[in-house]
Swiss-Prot record:
<feature type="binding site">
    <location>
        <begin position="124"/>
        <end position="126"/>
    </location>
    <ligand>
        <name>phosphate</name>
    </ligand>
</feature>
<dbReference type="InterPro" id="IPR015847">
    <property type="entry name" value="ExoRNase_PH_dom2"/>
</dbReference>
<dbReference type="GO" id="GO:0016075">
    <property type="term" value="P:rRNA catabolic process"/>
</dbReference>
<keyword id="KW-0694">RNA-binding</keyword>
<comment type="function">
    <text>Phosphorolytic 3'-5' exoribonuclease that plays an important role in tRNA 3'-end maturation. Removes nucleotide residues following the 3'-CCA terminus of tRNAs; can also add nucleotides to the ends of RNA molecules by using nucleoside diphosphates as substrates, but this may not be physiologically important. Probably plays a role in initiation of 16S rRNA degradation (leading to ribosome degradation) during starvation.</text>
</comment>
<comment type="similarity">
    <text>Belongs to the RNase PH family.</text>
</comment>
<comment type="subunit">
    <text>Homohexameric ring arranged as a trimer of dimers.</text>
</comment>
<keyword id="KW-0698">rRNA processing</keyword>
<dbReference type="GO" id="GO:0008033">
    <property type="term" value="P:tRNA processing"/>
</dbReference>
<dbReference type="InterPro" id="IPR002381">
    <property type="entry name" value="RNase_PH_bac-type"/>
</dbReference>
<dbReference type="Pfam" id="PF01138">
    <property type="entry name" value="RNase_PH"/>
</dbReference>
<dbReference type="GO" id="GO:0009022">
    <property type="term" value="F:tRNA nucleotidyltransferase activity"/>
</dbReference>
<protein>
    <recommendedName>
        <fullName>Ribonuclease PH</fullName>
        <ecNumber>2.7.7.56</ecNumber>
    </recommendedName>
</protein>
<dbReference type="InterPro" id="IPR027408">
    <property type="entry name" value="PNPase/RNase_PH_dom_sf"/>
</dbReference>
<dbReference type="InterPro" id="IPR050080">
    <property type="entry name" value="RNase_PH"/>
</dbReference>
<keyword id="KW-0819">tRNA processing</keyword>
<dbReference type="InterPro" id="IPR036345">
    <property type="entry name" value="ExoRNase_PH_dom2_sf"/>
</dbReference>
Length: 245
C-alpha cells in the first residue's frame, strides 16, 4: 500500500472543471490529487512569422507556478527577469505534445496559446498540464466550429499524460505524488494518444538503473493510466466528443 493508500497502479482522484475562467476561449481547472493546474487556450488570428503563408496553424505553450504552489514559497520567475531551464523544457514539452494531435492545416493560419498555471503542486505538474491543456484546447476549437471559422474540430486524436516510476519496496507505481517522486529510483513521464501511440517518453534512473522488463512494466502501467485519463477527458467534454470521434 502506498503512502496515500492507493494501489500500485491506481491513479489519484482526477477532476476536470471545464470553462473555469470567463475570458479564454477554452479553460479548465484540472485536479490530480493535490496537484491543481489552471489551463487556458487562447485563439489568435495569426501565426508566428516563420509560419506565414504556409496555410497552417501553430500551437505553443507557457507554463508557470504561483509562489506558494509549493510547500516553501518560490520567487516568481518574472522577478528574476528570466525563465528557468526547467520551465522552458516543460513549455516546449506541452506545445510539442499538443501539436502531435492537432490538424494544423485544418486549424488554418491561427495560433493557439496554451497557458498552464500551477496553483498547487504535489507531483506530476507537467503531465497534469498536458492532460488539462488538451481539454482546454478542444473547448476553444469548439468555439471556432460554432463560429464557422473551421469545418471541423482540428484534432486527430485524444492526448493525455501521466507519470510512472519505481519506488523502493513498492516496485512500479503509477501517477507519483511529490513524496513518491522525491524518493523514486526511476522516474518517467509518458504521453500517449487515444489510439495508444506514444508521443513522448521521458525516463531517468535516479542513481539507479532499470531493465528492459521493468521498462515494459512501466509503459504498461502508464498506458493503463492514460486510457483512464482519456475517459475522464471525454466525460468532461460531453457532447463535444461527437465532433472528435
Amino acid at each position: 500500500m502506498r503512502v496515500d493508500g492507493r494501489e500500485k497502479t491506481e491513479l489519484r482522484h482526477i477532476h476536470i472543471h471545464t470553462n473555469y475562467l470567463k475570458h479564454p476561449e477554452g479553460s479548465v481547472l484540472i485536479e490530480v490529487g493535490d496537484t491543481k493546474v489552471i489551463c487556458s487556450a487562447t485563439i489568435e488570428e495569426r501565426v508566428p512569422p516563420f509560419m506565414r503563408g504556409e496555410g497552417k496553424g501553430w500551437v505553443t505553450a507557457e507554463y508557470a507556478m504561483i509562489p506558494r504552489a509549493t510547500e516553501q514559497r518560490t520567487i516568481r520567475e518574472s522577478s528574476k527577469g528570466k525563465v528557468t531551464g526547467r520551465t522552458m523544457e516543460i513549455q516546449r514539452l506541452i506545445g510539442r505534445a499538443l501539436r502531435a494531435v492537432v490538424d494544423l492545416e485544418a486549424l488554418g493560419e491561427r495560433t493557439v496559446w496554451i497557458d498552464c498555471d500551477v496553483i498547487q503542486a504535489d507531483g506530476g505538474t507537467r503531465t497534469a498540464s498536458i492532460t488539462g491543456a488538451y481539454v482546454a484546447m478542444v473547448l476553444a476549437f469548439e468555439k471556432l466550429l460554432q463560429a464557422e471559422k473551421v469545418s471541423k474540430i482540428p484534432v486527430k486524436d485524444y492526448l493525455a499524460a501521466t507519470s510512472v516510476g519505481i519506488v523502493e519496496e513498492q516496485g512500479v507505481v503509477l501517477d507519483l505524488n511529490y513524496a513518491e517522486d522525491s524518493k523514486a529510483d526511476v522516474d518517467m513521464n509518458v504521453i500517449m494518444t487515444g489510439k495508444g501511440q506514444f508521443v513522448e517518453v521521458q525516463g531517468t534512473g535516479e542513481e539507479a538503473t532499470f531493465s528492459r522488463a521493468q521498462l515494459n512494466e512501466l509503459l504498461d502501467a502508464a498506458e493503463q493510466g492514460i486510457f483512464q485519463l482519456i475517459d475522464i477527458q471525454k466525460e468532461a467534454l460531453g457532447d463535444i466528443v461527437s465532433h472528435i470521434e
